[in-house]
């Protein structure tokens, strides 16, 4: 059997670099790269060139080939591209133009030549860049195998990308600083466009696209970010800084803002079309800063066309433009609010000062009544100012909530700073809720009540307002002067919404007393004992709880020598009431009642509606002979009425419109020694006459106001004491600052307590043994049950 031959497998033969001539293959590639740069590629064979590169890479010449290609590209750019670009740069024209735009010089004939030179230089640069891009794409295609095998394994950037980087280093960042000159030339062109010239926008866009596609040396940003953006923003700031300072003194505010708005739109359009959108935001910020932010005060303070002037002239279009423009910048709305507060403070001060001066004049001549005219005028002026500004903000400023809040704060400052504001607001409400105001406010009660609540929000001393409001409400209720119960309760409901249940508790108690009094009075009049003997007069009684009503229970206020006919009725009602309410005490308060009295004069009879005190006075003249008089002191002795009440009622009877009595000597004031006669010759066209007590609803004089505030201060002490005890009872132990803060928070809805007041009340409660300090820490309080 014949033996078969052995099969031998040989190892593959190793290729040696020496087997391939690098120079031969490189010469082919080098010549081809040159032809590509020269745009002479018609005779080139892609397959042949690819094969030459493939062989070199395959035979371990990848690194050498990569470096040689890099050197050829660098040499080509340095020796041919850079000189070709630079010869198109007119250093004289463009250099001088750059200096001029920093100064924002006016247009001159040299600008047209600068425009041509700029276009020529940038065109040369852009064309070179585009040619280089095309060339590198072709070279990269030929050397695709080099990138695939060598560049990737050696962690080298691909040939195409490397060629782009070489362009950056050799052309843009060389010693000639072509990149910087490119940016400066773009700045010149943008400047010329801002001045009204037409420029080649696509050319600039190509330049910026080039810069944006080239990474900076740290590769975190592009040349656009490093070379162009900072310098462009700097030159833009300089341009608008000079422009704004030049024109702001020439144009009115509206004209200036319209010009600024036009500039904003131009820059937005410029960013969109050729500057790249990524610079839009910082660019607009720079323009807004220079045109608006740095001139906010200048624009608002302009004497003839500024913010105050626009408000005074109701320039809604201008105010809307101001708001829209100022809303662009960070501090714009804040500045608007500041100047709005200034406007309110200025006009509020005028309102307060003119009212105070007029009030002082009335006090000097003793004329404080006129149905609280001063209070009504003050309120009307404040409301007119509020309505006007509120309308302006709602109409021209999109009802901006922050500006409306600022407006409210400004009104709080000037209204709350006027010490008579709580009294005036209460008098205004009183004036509008009386029966004789029906025609004046018919169909607009809701608006009046809402306006009143608006003013109520502006006062911090709500307890002072409550003091006056209770007094005025009491007079309306007891004298049956309210326009309607619904209107009164509607006002109280609004106050409750604003200040809470506690604030209106006493006001609601007053209404409840009136309702209960009506029920009790009906029961009294149907009482069998009363029915058996017809009374000499018809008695109507209101039972008022002293906790709700603003009643001065001082002995001199409740004393009065009632006539026998009235005293009998008083005793009878007292017996009836005490039979139903054992343990209670009735105090008769003459100064808050009224009476219907039929009086016989020489010609005819008249039915007079007067105060209870006035009826007591009139009855003194019932048995006097003709021409017999009573001296003031006699009336005082016979009636035992408090001097102030007596004088006011005598003024109503002898010094007002209807002179039921005659006074000697004549005059508006009642003094000791004055003589009073019954006016038998009194005549009037009215059969029924209402005689109101003089100054029943008037502004308080200084002494009365002092007494009112003293009562308020005393009430505040009690409120503070109750609040401190309430907090300590709940917490048992509390640190000083925490107690101060909590008490302040709880009392703020009624009044703003000072830290000193709270400290004094704490000390008073410690003395009264409601609280004590901890033995080892005097700043911690303990509640004593």
Curated annotation (Swiss-Prot):
Probable component of multiple cullin-RING-based BC3B (BTB-CUL3-BTB) E3 ubiquitin-protein ligase complexes formed by cul-3, rbx-1 and a variable BTB domain-containing protein as adapter and substrate recognition component. Interacts with btb1, btb2, btb3, nedd8 and pip1. One of its GO terms (cellular component) is Cul3-RING ubiquitin ligase complex. Belongs to the cullin family. Probable core component of multiple cullin-RING-based BC3B (BTB-CUL3-BTB) E3 ubiquitin-protein ligase complexes which mediate the ubiquitination and subsequent proteasomal degradation of target proteins. As a scaffold protein may contribute to catalysis through positioning of the substrate and the ubiquitin-conjugating enzyme. The functional specificity of the BC3B complex depends on the substrate recognition component. Involved in ubiquitin-mediated degradation of btb3. Pfam families: Cullin (PF00888), Cullin_Nedd8 (PF10557). Residues 715-777 form the Cullin neddylation domain. The lineage of its organism: Eukaryota, Fungi, Dikarya, Ascomycota, Taphrinomycotina. Neddylated; enhancing the ubiquitin-ligase activity. Keywords: Cytoplasm, Isopeptide bond, Ubl conjugation, Ubl conjugation pathway. Changing residue 729 to R: No cross-link with NEDD8. PANTHER family: CULLIN. It comes from the Eukaryota. This is Cullin-3. It is found in: Cytoplasm. GO terms for biological process: proteasome-mediated ubiquitin-dependent protein catabolic process; protein ubiquitination. The keyword GTP-binding does not apply. Pathway: Protein modification; protein ubiquitination. Its main location: cytoplasm. There is a cross-link at residue 729 (Glycyl lysine isopeptide (Lys-Gly) (interchain with G-Cter in NEDD8)). One of its GO terms (molecular function) is ubiquitin protein ligase binding.
């Amino acid at each position: 059997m014949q033996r078969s031959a052995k099969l031998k497998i040989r190892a593959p033969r190793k290729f040696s670099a020496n087997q391939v001539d690098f120079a031969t293959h490189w010469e082919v590639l080098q010549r081809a790269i040159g032809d590509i740069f020269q745009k002479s590629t018609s005779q080139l064979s892609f397959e042949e060139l690819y094969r030459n590169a493939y062989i070199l890479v395959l035979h371990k010449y990848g690194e050498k080939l990569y470096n040689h290609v890099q050197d050829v590209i660098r040499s080509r750019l340095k020796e041919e591209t850079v000189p070709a670009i630079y010869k198109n740069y007119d250093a004289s024209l463009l250099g001088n133009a750059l200096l001029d735009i920093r100064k924002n010089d006016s247009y001159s004939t040299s600008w047209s030549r600068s425009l041509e030179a700029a276009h020529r230089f940038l065109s040369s640069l852009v064309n070179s860049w585009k040619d280089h891009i095309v060339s590198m794409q072709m070279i990269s295609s030929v050397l695709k195998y080099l990138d695939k095998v060598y560049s990737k394994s050696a962690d080298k950037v691909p040939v195409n990308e490397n060629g782009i980087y070489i362009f950056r280093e050799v052309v843009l960042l060389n010693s000639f600083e072509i990149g910087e000159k490119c940016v400066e030339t773009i700045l010149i062109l943008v400047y010329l466009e801002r001045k009204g010239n037409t420029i080649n926008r696509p050319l600039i866009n190509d330049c910026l696209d080039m810069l944006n596609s080239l990474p900076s040396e740290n590769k975190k940003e592009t040349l656009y970010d490093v070379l162009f953006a900072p310098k462009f923003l700097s030159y833009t700031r300089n341009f608008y800084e000079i422009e704004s300072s030049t024109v702001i003194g020439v144009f009115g505010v509206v004209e200036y803002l319209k010009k600024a708005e036009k500039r904003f739109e131009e820059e937005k359009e410029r960013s969109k079309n050729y500057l790249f959108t990524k610079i839009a935001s910082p660019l607009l910020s720079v323009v807004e800063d220079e045109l608006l932010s740095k001139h906010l005060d200048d624009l608002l303070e302009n004497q003839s066309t500024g913010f105050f002037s626009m408000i005074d002239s109701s320039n809604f279009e201008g105010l809307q433009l101001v708001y829209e423009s100022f809303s662009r910048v960070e501090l714009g709305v804040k500045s608007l609010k500041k100047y709005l507060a200034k406007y309110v403070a200025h006009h509020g001060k005028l309102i307060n000062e003119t009212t105070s001066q007029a009030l002082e004049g009335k006090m000097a001549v003793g004329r404080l009544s006129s149905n609280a005219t001063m209070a009504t005028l003050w309120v009307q002026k404040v409301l007119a100012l509020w309505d006007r500004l509120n309308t302006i903000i709602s109409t021209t400023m999109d009802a901006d909530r922050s500006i409306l809040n600022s407006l409210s704060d400004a009104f709080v400052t000037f209204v709350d700073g006027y010490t008579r504001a709580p009294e005036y607001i209460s008098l205004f409400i009183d004036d509008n809720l009386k029966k004789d105001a029906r025609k004046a406010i018919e169909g607009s009660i809701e608006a009046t009540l809402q306006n009143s609540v608006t003013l109520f929000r502006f006062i911090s001393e709500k307890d002072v307002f409550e003091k006056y409001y209770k007094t005025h409400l009491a007079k309306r209720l007891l004298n049956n002067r309210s326009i309607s119960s619904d209107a009164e309760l509607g006002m109280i409901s609004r106050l409750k919404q604003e200040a809470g249940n506690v604030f209106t508790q006493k006001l609601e108690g007053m209404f409840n007393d009136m309702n209960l009094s009506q029920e009790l009075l009906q029961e009294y009049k149907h009482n069998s004992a009363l029915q058996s003997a017809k009374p000499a007069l018809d008695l109507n009684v209101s039972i008022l709880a002293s906790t709700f009503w603003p009643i001065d229970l001082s002995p001199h206020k409740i004393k009065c020598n009632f006539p026998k006919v009235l005293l009998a009725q008083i005793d009878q009602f007292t017996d009836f009431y005490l039979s139903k309410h054992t343990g209670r005490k009735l105090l008769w308060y003459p100064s808050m009642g009224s009476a219907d009295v039929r009086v016989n004069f020489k010609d005819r009879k008249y039915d007079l509606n007067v105060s209870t005190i006035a009826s007591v006075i009139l009855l003194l003249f019932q048995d006097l002979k003709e021409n017999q008089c009573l001296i003031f002191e006699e009336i005082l002795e016979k009636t035992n009425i408090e001097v102030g009440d007596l004088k006011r009622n005598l003024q109503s009877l002898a010094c007002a419109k209807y002179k039921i009595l005659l006074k000697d000597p004549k005059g508006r004031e009642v003094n000791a020694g004055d003589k009073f006669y019954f006016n038998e010759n009194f005549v009037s066209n009215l059969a029924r006459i209402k005689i109101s007590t003089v100054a029943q609803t008037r502004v308080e004089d200084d002494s009365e106001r002092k007494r009112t505030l003293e009562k308020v201060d005393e009430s505040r002490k009690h409120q503070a004491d109750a609040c401190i005890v309430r907090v300590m009872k709940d917490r048992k132990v509390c640190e000083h600052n925490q107690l101060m803060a909590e008490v302040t928070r709880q009392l703020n809805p009624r009044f703003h307590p000072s830290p000193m007041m709270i400290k004094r009340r704490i000390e008073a409660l410690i003395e009264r043994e409601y609280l004590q300090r901890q033995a080892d820490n005097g700043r911690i309080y303990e509640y004593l049950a």
